[in-house]
Amino acid sequence: MAGRSMQAARCPTDELSLSNCAVVSEKDYQSGQHVIVRTSPNHKYIFTLRTHPSVVPGSVAFSLPQRKWAGLSIGQEIEVALYSFDKAKQCIGTMTIEIDFLQKKNIDSNPYDTDKMAAEFIQQFNNQAFSVGQQLVFSFNDKLFGLLVKDIEAMDPSILKGEPASGKRQKIEVGLVVGNSQVAFEKAENSSLNLIGKAKTKENRQSIINPDWNFEKMGIGGLDKEFSDIFRRAFASRVFPPEIVEQMGCKHVKGILLYGPPGCGKTLLARQIGKMLNAREPKVVNGPEILNKYVGESEANIRKLFADAEEEQRRLGANSGLHIIIFDEIDAICKQRGSMAGSTGVHDTVVNQLLSKIDGVEQLNNILVIGMTNRPDLIDEALLRPGRLEVKMEIGLPDEKGRLQILHIHTARMRGHQLLSADVDIKELAVETKNFSGAELEGLVRAAQSTAMNRHIKASTKVEVDMEKAESLQVTRGDFLASLENDIKPAFGTNQEDYASYIMNGIIKWGDPVTRVLDDGELLVQQTKNSDRTPLVSVLLEGPPHSGKTALAAKIAEESNFPFIKICSPDKMIGFSETAKCQAMKKIFDDAYKSQLSCVVVDDIERLLDYVPIGPRFSNLVLQALLVLLKKAPPQGRKLLIIGTTSRKDVLQEMEMLNAFSTTIHVPNIATGEQLLEALELLGNFKDKERTTIAQQVKGKKVWIGIKKLLMLIEMSLQMDPEYRVRKFLALLREEGASPLDFD
């Protein structure tokens, strides 16, 4: 049918504006017909018609979105002709529509179900023409939305013939909505509309994970397992598209607590998580910075941290970006409520504010709070429940593989510039640096570098660098070993000075009893290392005073080669109150729990307990603390050997402490003349002739003297002239009551 010239007019009613139809007089066309409107030779638009009595014959009424789309002005001459659809090729299979609120003043954050929207759309616009780029108004739930047709795919022709789907779908510019057309809604860019349901497009989202990161570039070593656990718990759900997360009813993890000894990489890990993610820069806050001297300001500082996340959640809903807030030393502001003295309760209100912001009445789903502390026991328990800081990750001392990674990272630049000598074996250093934290390993590398640099400084009146030699500067294996020996000692390691003083005279194996003690000690060390059933092994060395119990305990500890060895000795607690003693003992054991293999020597237990026979008197508080610590098993995967020493087995028996030890080993005094002579021979202080004289007096006789006391008597007699030494020694032996005999 040939076209006719008509005039564009304004749509007569608001209701007809929402119909997406062009409105004509019933004298011109019938309702339901489709027309092609030409505004110029190259511009044509297809509309579905409705009739209304108020429209003047010879004119076509268009709504504002239609006039905007077609570029029409009121009164403009247009050419109108009937248009018929080819039902085999132009039925709409799938149509993608961009949607936003029509007016900005009507914006809200309520979720809109796209499945219901799609059903309403098909009902309102069934059998109507749609073109790519077309604009229209859509009414749903008493709200007006502006729509823009983005994409149209024709229905599979096989379905129209009643055959199985062939999978062929063709993109078309113009199509007809039918009852089984599919509509997918896509949120307009920067829109705050919150769409839910399945009838929405999968949004092109930027991946949350930065594509070009790796552990070595991040400078993190030895934390592979911890990092993968954090990723699984905190980020896996954020990698998936929001629609899948929504269908699962899944809520993202909002908080992580990293805890562990100082220098093990908590702050480093949190800092690098921000770089790993394609999120905005994390807000890093030191705990004490939150506190303010003015009333209410501390709480306001907490609110400011969350303000950006709240505003974006209101605007973008589920598509809000991730906001990371990092609290360093979180124990400064999140102590147990009610634990602080004073009437102000500032700390309590700060904790309350933080609790309500992370998981309160208005829930935020676009935040990740990372807290760090080396005192997790101080933190309020409400902060650690699921929904708040629910992922609790211990960042402990690195194992050998971890130390290898850390040393590799810290020597990478030297290796790249050929400043690391070929004789440096990183694997050897990783083995030697047991119980070193990441910070201590970095310090070791720094110390080795300074040792190497020091070689090239001229020793003259002025400090000068020998530039000729400096060109050939290299850090050698010797530099690392020297730094290991002299400069850097691990905080949770073995301080040799600790136990070296106890065995400065060596171990004198004067007889089978000493050998048996050392052999049994070695068995207990092997049991601690190898047994999975007994992670806690404790042994009590008991015997008379001066029999060498402490030296044997220190020797067993040294021979164990455990990475952590500590001696809990009364000489380090002189003047301590009972509470201070308990705290000091608890700290030693807590430090031991942080190491994979640990040995604690509890020396002179009756002195630790302040025991005196007159009264009798002892500290019950220290006794109970020690009993608990002796029986407490170390954490999963950690092993602990406890060696106790006492001269008063009978007292510990009455205090019911003997049962707290796995086993008891008796350390006797020297009891026979033969054992005494063996000890003298091993010590080598007396000449053969002198020893023969002593042998004549003691051989076959009973004696009773501790090895420590024997050493004292020998050293005292050696101060005499050579001809009087033996006589003096025998006299001292008699005076000490070591033998009932009268020596000549």
Swiss-Prot record:
GO terms for molecular function: ATP binding; ATP hydrolysis activity; ATP-dependent protein disaggregase activity; identical protein binding; ionotropic glutamate receptor binding; metal ion binding; PDZ domain binding; protein kinase binding. Its main location: cytoplasm. SUPFAM superfamilies: ADC-like, Cdc48 domain 2-like, P-loop containing nucleoside triphosphate hydrolases. Its cofactor is Mg(2+). It is found in: Cytoplasm. ATP binds at N505, G506, I507, I508, K509, W510, P545, H546, S547, G548, K549, T550, A551, L552. It is an enzyme of class 3 (hydrolase). Keywords: Acetylation, ATP-binding, Cytoplasm, Hydrolase, Magnesium, Metal-binding, Nucleotide-binding, Phosphoprotein, Protein transport, Repeat, Transport. Mg(2+) binds at T550. Phosphorylation at Ser-569 interferes with homohexamerization. GO terms for cellular component: cytosol; Golgi stack; midbody; plasma membrane. Gene3D superfamilies: 1.10.8.60, 2.40.40.20, 3.10.330.10, P-loop containing nucleotide triphosphate hydrolases (3.40.50.300). The modification Phosphoserine is found at S207, S569. It catalyses: ATP + H2O = ADP + phosphate + H(+). Its EC number is 3.6.4.6. Signal peptide: none annotated. It holds the Pfam family CDC48_N. One of its GO terms (biological process) is positive regulation of receptor recycling. The modification Phosphotyrosine is found at Y259. Binds 1 Mg(2+) ion per subunit. Required for vesicle-mediated transport. Catalyzes the fusion of transport vesicles within the Golgi cisternae. Is also required for transport from the endoplasmic reticulum to the Golgi stack. Seems to function as a fusion protein required for the delivery of cargo proteins to all compartments of the Golgi stack independent of vesicle origin. Interaction with AMPAR subunit GRIA2 leads to influence GRIA2 membrane cycling. Homohexamer. Interacts with GABARAP and GABARAPL2. Interacts with GRIA2. Interacts with PLK2, leading to disrupt the interaction with GRIA2. Interacts with MUSK; may regulate MUSK endocytosis and activity. Interacts with CDK16. Belongs to the AAA ATPase family. This is Vesicle-fusing ATPase. It comes from Cricetulus griseus. The gene is NSF.
